[in-house]
Swiss-Prot record:
GO CC annotation, single: cytoplasm
Record-given protein name: Elongation factor G
Location of the protein in the cell: Cytoplasm
Function in brief: Catalyzes the GTP-dependent ribosomal translocation step during translation elongation. During this step, the ribosome changes from the pre-translocational (PRE) to the post-translocational (POST) state as the newly formed A-site-bound peptidyl-tRNA and P-site-bound deacylated tRNA move to the P and E sites, respectively. Catalyzes the coordinated movement of the two tRNA molecules, the mRNA and conformational changes in the ribosome.
Transmembrane annotation, as ranges: none
Species whose genome carries this gene: Thermus aquaticus
Keyword set, alphabetical order: Cytoplasm, Elongation factor, GTP-binding, Nucleotide-binding, Protein biosynthesis
Family: Belongs to the GTP-binding elongation factor family. EF-G/EF-2 subfamily.
Single GO molecular function: translation elongation factor activity
Kinase keyword on record: no
Record's keyword annotation contains Cytoplasm: yes
Amino acid sequence: HYQEVPRQIQEKLIKGQ
């Protein structure tokens, strides 16, 4: 359930990979 997570965190996770 990552709908409440902002896109900044998702982008950081994607760029963190």
